[in-house]
């Protein structure tokens, strides 16, 4: 170096700051991990980003840009031809924690990690010099993500001489290009020492040749018009100062041919390798101010996708702290058939959606009347006079209403009259078709809810539920009382098999609708009863599904999510609720082995006989014999009493 070079003025070096570009896919993945995996754990997570090596200057690459996307969470996923940077994610749990955390101390802690890693390395390993950290808070309800990226930078007192010598660039650029192309991995050669042996140029990153000066090549990630290198160079310069270099030439290599050389001199008087250097590195905003950024994805994500994620949000939050072992997937996967689209059907459907159930089918043959909307939340006033003043069909309208509430639900409404025992068949073709449709619906669904108005309408679904081994839940209302129960399963031990809706009856169900006054035909109940019964019916299902035995669970067994009772009876007049157990009855008109076997043998023919004559069913299941034995026992009791004429008058 000439004397004029040695005495040239020294100026403080300038660098192009690094910025970040965080794609929406990064936050989408972060929200998924936060909800399902991280939960309340705010431990630091390893991630990675990348910087491209552009070949043409444009407004997007005039400064080095760290890119973060979906693949940043997969350490193994790395694209070729990019400079990959390792990093750490620190996702806090509250916005207050994000705001109040001491950013200076946090950057210092991160900088110490880089400093420790740097002074312990003996090579120019790219990963030791380039690290980033990102502090985040995820507002999963509003899809807002607060974040601040830091690139910890170690500062050493290097100065740039006012003299430039581009002869190094002209002399070595072609050789550097060839070496980079032959290496095929620009990441490994991001910073390397240039040396020559017999006129040939070599790049070495495995060791630093002992010297007070040297020539190094820095592969720059930006194409800024000014002759300023990226700020990433500062950590390499600190490393050289730590290793004893006082005078270095750096060739800042760029892909577009605009490479340049900078000569650096160390102020040895102010550099102390035994003292941790000043650490900087928080990214500035586009206005040049220090501060975090906000990514609001609410306006970018498809509303249907937003709704789908939001439906599951509160459910998954249960697993964070309250019920970590709750199996939500098994609930979500259930295909549910609701027999009845009235008051109970409406409330049960809403509660099922709240639990994330996506497949719900309604069966009902009624139309919406003016008295319905106030008690049945899936209907509105306009539904009462639609379809030429007849009112909408309940099943179809209920299915539409669910889709209006949540477009991601698969909901269907089927207008169907369920064949009822005690109501003789008047049109066999139609009744048989209805039976076939109902039977197919049972095959296509996992869960059956019996929510109809009349007692006899539940008989055939009860038989089908046992024959097809389905989970059947029954909900029935009185004026100020309710019953919620689950039916048993034929695979349960007979001595402990749960009873069904009809197991306490000594007569077969019959016509309860004919010759009834208005107050007897309408469901006259206190309005709150339906909500209570519906909620319990859905919560009972969830408890059943959490039990390893499912519908085979014995009465009142418990799971990690609570009990699994057989029956729940509630009474509003004294605001009491009772759990009951009723074993199966061997002569039950719906679930006895005799009835189920006969149904499996004859199918529709058996059903038709029962519909036309409930007495036939009583003979098949044995209730007729029970009734006869009871009558005979009564007669025998009367004979044994041997009343005289004076005592017999009170029997009249």
Curated annotation (Swiss-Prot):
Its main location: cytoplasm. The keyword Cytoplasm applies. GO terms for cellular component: cytosol; extrinsic component of phagophore assembly site membrane. A motif (GXGXXG motif) lies at residues 340-345. It comes from the Eukaryota. CDD domains: Apg7. The keyword Magnesium does not apply. It is found in: Cytoplasm; Preautophagosomal structure. Keywords: Autophagy, Cytoplasm, Protein transport, Transport, Ubl conjugation pathway. The active site is at 522 (glycyl thioester intermediate). It holds the Pfam family ATG7_N. One of its GO terms (molecular function) is identical protein binding. One of its GO terms (biological process) is cytoplasm to vacuole targeting by the Cvt pathway. Gene3D superfamilies: NAD(P)-binding Rossmann-like Domain, Ubiquitin-like modifier-activating enzyme ATG7 C-terminal domain, Ubiquitin-like modifier-activating enzyme ATG7 N-terminal domain. Belongs to the ATG7 family. The GxGxxG motif is important for the function, possibly through binding with ATP. E1-like activating enzyme involved in the 2 ubiquitin-like systems required for cytoplasm to vacuole transport (Cvt) and autophagy. Activates ATG12 for its conjugation with ATG5 and ATG8 for its conjugation with phosphatidylethanolamine. Both systems are needed for the ATG8 association to Cvt vesicles and autophagosomes membranes. Autophagy is essential for maintenance of amino acid levels and protein synthesis under nitrogen starvation. Homodimer. This is Ubiquitin-like modifier-activating enzyme ATG7. It comes from Scheffersomyces stipitis (strain ATCC 58785 / CBS 6054 / NBRC 10063 / NRRL Y-11545). The gene is ATG7.
């Amino acid at each position: 170096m000439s004397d004029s070079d040695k005495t040239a003025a020294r100026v403080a070096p300038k660098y192009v700051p690094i910025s970040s570009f965080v794609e929406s896919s990064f936050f989408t993945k972060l929200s998924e991990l936060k909800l399902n995996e991280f939960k309340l754990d705010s431990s630091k997570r390893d991630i990675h980003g990348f910087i491209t090596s552009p070949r043409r200057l444009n407004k997007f690459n005039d400064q080095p840009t760290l890119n973060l996307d979906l693949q940043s969470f997969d350490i193994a996923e790395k694209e070729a031809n990019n400079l990959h940077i390792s990093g750490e994610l620190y996702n806090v749990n509250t916005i207050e924690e994000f705001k109040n955390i001491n950013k200076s101390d946090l950057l210092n802690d991160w900088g110490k990690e880089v400093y420790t890693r740097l002074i312990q390395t003996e090579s120019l390993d790219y990963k030791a010099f380039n690290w980033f950290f990102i502090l985040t808070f995820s507002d999963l309800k509003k899809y807002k993500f607060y974040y601040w990226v830091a690139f910890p930078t170690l500062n050493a007192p290097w100065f740039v001489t006012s003299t430039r010598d581009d002869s190094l660039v002209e002399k070595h650029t072609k050789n550097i290009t060839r070496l980079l192309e032959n290496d095929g991995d620009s990441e490994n050669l991001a910073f390397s020492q240039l040396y020559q042996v017999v006129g040939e140029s070599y790049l070495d990153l495995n060791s630093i040749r002992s010297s007070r000066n040297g020539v190094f090549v820095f592969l720059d990630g930006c194409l800024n018009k000014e002759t300023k290198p990226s700020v990433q160079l500062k950590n390499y310069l600190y490393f050289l100062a730590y290793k004893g270099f006082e005078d270095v030439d750096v060739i800042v290599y760029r892909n577009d041919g605009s490479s340049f050389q900078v000569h650096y001199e160390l102020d040895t008087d102010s550099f102390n390798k035994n003292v941790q250097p000043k650490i900087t590195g928080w990214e500035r905003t586009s206005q040049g101010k220090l501060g975090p950024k906000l990514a609001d994805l609410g306006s970018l994500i498809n509303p249907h996708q937003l709704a789908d994620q939001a439906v599951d949000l509160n459910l998954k939050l249960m697993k964070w702290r309250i019920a970590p072992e709750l199996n939500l997937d098994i609930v979500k996967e259930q295909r549910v058939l609701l027999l009845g689209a009235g008051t109970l059907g409406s409330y049960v459907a809403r509660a099922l959606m709240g639990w994330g159930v996506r497949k719900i089918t309604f069966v009902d043959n009624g139309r919406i009347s003016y008295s319905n909307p106030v008690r049945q939340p899936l209907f509105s006033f306009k539904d009462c006079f639609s379809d030429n003043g007849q009112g909408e069909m309940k099943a179809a309208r209920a299915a539409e209403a669910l889709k209006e509430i949540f477009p991601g639900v698969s909901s269907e409404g089927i207008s169907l009259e369920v064949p009822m025992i005690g109501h003789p068949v008047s049109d066999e073709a139609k009744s048989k078709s209805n039976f076939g449709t109902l039977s197919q619906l049972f095959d296509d669904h996992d869960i059956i809810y019996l929510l109809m108005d009349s007692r006899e309408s539940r008989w055939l679904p009860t038989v089908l539920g046992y024959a097809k081994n389905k989970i059947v839940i029954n909900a029935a209302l009185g004026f100020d009382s309710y019953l919620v129960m689950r039916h048993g399963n034929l695979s349960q031990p007979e001595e402990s098999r749960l009873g069904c809706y009809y197991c306490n009856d000594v007569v077969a169900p019959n016509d309860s609708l004919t010759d009834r006054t208005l107050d007897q035909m309408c469901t006259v109940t206190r309005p709150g009863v339906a909500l209570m019964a519906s909620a319990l019916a859905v919560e009972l299902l969830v408890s059943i599904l959490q039990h390893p035995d499912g519908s085979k669970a014995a009465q009142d067994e418990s799971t990690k999510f609570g009990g699994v009772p057989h029956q729940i009876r509630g009474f509003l007049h004294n605001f009491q609720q009772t759990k009951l157990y009723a074993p199966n009855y061997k002569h039950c008109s719906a679930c006895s082995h005799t009835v189920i076997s006969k149904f499996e043998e004859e199918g529709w023919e058996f059903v038709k006989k029962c519909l036309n004559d409930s007495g036939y069913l009583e003979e098949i299941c044995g209730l007729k014999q029970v009734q006869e034995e009871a009558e005979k026992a009564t007669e025998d009791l009367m004979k044994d009493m041997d009343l005289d004429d004076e005592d017999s008058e009170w029997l009249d």
